[in-house]
Swiss-Prot record:
Source species: Glebionis coronaria (Crown daisy)
Coiled coil (residue ranges): none
Family assignment from sequence similarity: Belongs to the thaumatin family.
Protein name in UniProt: Thaumatin-like protein 5
InterPro entries: Osmotin/thaumatin-like_sf (IPR037176)
């Protein structure tokens, strides 16, 4: 599965996923997260 995370807030956010780590997103920036088939536990 693919997830697109987009910061629509007027301030910087720290987007995180486990497993996968984190990323700083400025206003309007996005990050893509790919989750492998068969993944049984994850958090965004």
């Amino acid at each position: 599965a693919n997830f697109d995370i987009i910061n629509q807030x007027p301030y910087t956010v720290x987007a995180a996923a486990s497993p996968g780590g984190g990323r700083r997103l400025e206003t309007g920036q996005s990050x893509x997260l790919q989750v492998a088939p068969g993944t049984t536990x994850a958090a965004i």
